[in-house]
């Protein structure tokens, strides 16, 4: 069903599925450590985000018809540079990742149209990071901390800190929705020392 709907959306015929989208196996049938994008990968990424956008749009319209004063909110992780892997574009439609050179590996020219922040009254962003400030990232020396959530990678970039994650969340939502920082309490089991500073930073850096 996904293949058929994607072909209708993109106006293409996927001759080799799923290899033309992505593949986990090499030519000899051996499992790769990381998946490899196929020739239609970027269009597939756009289509997946469109499915979620259209669902949010329909749900928003239906709920507001029942109660115009209803507050509609959403949660996602704050790691936007890799969150496209989950098929979700929680940014403002006016934020265009295609204009960011390092995002052009996955973003199409129309990807920004899948953003749905404008349809939210409140947005909670998951700041599930061991590092709290951007300065912590600079001092990390190869230690990435706990990263067990879907879509995360092991890069030492500012978005993988409470401060940096909040910063990018506010940047890409363009002020169209209040951004509330969310902290994962269980992440601090065994050592609650960073918990207070993490909460303080989240309160400072978000709305």
PLM regions: where:
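Carbohydrate-binding surfaces of carbohydrate-active enzymes
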Residues: 184, 197-207
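Polysaccharide-binding and catalytic clefts of secreted carbohydrate-active enzymes
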Residues: 1-163, 168
């Amino acid at each position: 069903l996904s293949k058929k709907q994607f072909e209708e959306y993109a106006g293409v015929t996927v001759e080799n599925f799923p290899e033309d989208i992505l593949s986990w196996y090499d030519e000899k049938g051996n499992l790769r450590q990381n998946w490899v994008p196929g020739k239609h990968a970027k269009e597939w990424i756009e289509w997946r985000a469109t499915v979620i956008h259209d669902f949010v749009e329909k749900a928003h319209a239906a709920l507001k018809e029942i109660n115009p004063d209803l507050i509609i909110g959403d949660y996602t992780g704050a790691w936007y540079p890799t969150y496209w892997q989950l098929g979700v574009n929680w940014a403002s439609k006016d934020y265009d990742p295609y204009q960011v050179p390092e995002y052009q590996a996955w973003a199409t020219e129309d990807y920004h149209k899948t953003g749905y922040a404008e349809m939210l009254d409140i947005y909670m962003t998951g700041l599930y990071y061991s590092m709290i400030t951007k300065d912590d990232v600079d001092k990390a020396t190869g230690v990435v901390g706990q990263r067990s959530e879907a879509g995360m990678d092991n890069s030492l970039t500012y978005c993988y800190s409470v401060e940096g994650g909040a910063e990018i969340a506010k940047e890409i939502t363009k002020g169209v929705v209040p951004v509330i920082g969310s902290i994962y309490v269980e992440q601090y089991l065994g050592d609650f020392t960073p918990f207070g500073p993490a909460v303080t930073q989240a309160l400072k850096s978000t709305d």
